[in-house]
């Protein structure tokens, strides 16, 4: 079901169905040929919109597309209604975040602005080229030429408070705080975990690192990410080969739609990678990590792969506590 698309007729926007899977009862949709309509009067509209198998979002009726005709299957399962309500709340937050970024771009100049000091100083970064504005925290070493660790949070810590990302992976922070290093903690704007917004955020992270005021060793830039952050790590390593000294993507993936041929795997060979995932993860499927770990090993790349069969999408805490990924890089 994760390869389906969820479409809302209100704003004709698309997003992956994955966030809604917990709300959808098993067996309520099959074969990826389901759609949802407000009522029967909108059936013609839906037929015109359907170019491929996809979900249509509402709280009305459930239909099955079959051989060019649409068969009504009765009222919507309650779980789908919950998914649609969740989607509406999500879109409201996403639109509010987009409006905030647009406002900031119109009032702020490019670059880094310090907001407050402290152990983890607070900053705001504006990148007009990539239409992105987000807060970040920086713990700068008192000594020069120390390594930089970039920690990318999961989707649950998205926002603009410059606070939630501090608590995304406590076991990892405990490791790093014992070492003399620089730590960068960006906070992704709400809704920047998909599509063009995600790509803009990823490019902005690299640009931010280039402009950081900290005097760190630019040959020792390490990047670690969890879930959405793990996906960002894969993308950054792919887009900027040889930029990072090493990368640790946890519960992420480079190619979640499994269209592996669109990526030149040779670009990944240039960066040492330690990937970690669990086979029972239902939020971010393990397929992409399985594929690239195997292919990179065939190419003789510096790749380490921690693959577990339990803990699901909560494996990161256990991984950081027991495997000590920060020590490994």
Each model region followed by its residue ranges:
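N-terminal accessory nucleic-acid engagement/regulatory domains that precede
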Residues: 1-63
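The conserved beta1-alpha1 loop
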Residues: 152-154, 251, 277
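A domain-start/cap signature at the N-terminus of enzymes
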Residues: 50-53, 62, 70, 74-148, ...
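C-terminal catalytic histidine-bearing segment of alpha/beta-hydrolase fold enzymes
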Residues: 276, 282, 287-293, 297-329
């Amino acid at each position: 079901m994760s390869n389906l698309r969820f479409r809302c007729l209100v704003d004709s926007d698309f997003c992956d169905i994955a966030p809604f899977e917990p709300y959808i009862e098993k067996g309520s949709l099959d074969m990826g040929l389901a759609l949802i309509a407000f009522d029967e009067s909108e059936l013609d509209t839906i037929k015109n919109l359907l170019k491929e198998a996809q979900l249509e979002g509402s709280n009305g009726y459930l239909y099955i597309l079959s051989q060019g005709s649409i068969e009504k299957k009765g009222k919507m399962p309650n779980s789908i209604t919950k998914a649609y309500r969740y989607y509406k709340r999500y879109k409201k937050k996403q639109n509010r975040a987009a409006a905030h970024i647009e406002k900031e771009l119109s009032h702020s100049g490019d670059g880094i602005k310090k907001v407050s000091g402290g152990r983890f100083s607070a900053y705001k970064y504006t990148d007009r080229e990539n239409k992105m504005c987000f807060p970040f925290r920086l713990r700068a070493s008192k000594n020069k030429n120390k390594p930089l660790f970039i920690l990318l949070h999961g989707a649950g810590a998205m926002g603009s408070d410059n606070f939630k990302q501090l608590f995304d992976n406590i076991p990892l922070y405990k490791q790093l705080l014992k070492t003399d290093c620089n730590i960068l903690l960006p906070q992704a704007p709400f809704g920047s975990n998909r599509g063009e917004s995600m790509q803009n955020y990823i490019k902005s992270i690299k640009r931010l690192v280039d402009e950081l005021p900290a005097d760190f060793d630019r040959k020792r830039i390490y990047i670690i990410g969890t879930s959405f952050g793990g996906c960002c790590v894969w993308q950054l390593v792919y887009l900027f080969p040889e930029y990072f000294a090493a990368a640790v993507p946890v519960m992420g993936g480079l190619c979640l739609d499994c269209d592996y041929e669109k990526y030149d795997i040779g670009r990944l060979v240039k960066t040492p990678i330690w990937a970690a995932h669990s086979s029972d993860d239902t939020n971010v499927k393990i397929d992409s990590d399985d594929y690239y770990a195997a292919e990179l090993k065939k190419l003789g790349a510096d790749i380490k792969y921690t693959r577990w069969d339990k803990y699901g999408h909560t494996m990161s805490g256990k991984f950081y506590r027991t495997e000590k990924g920060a020590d490994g890089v």
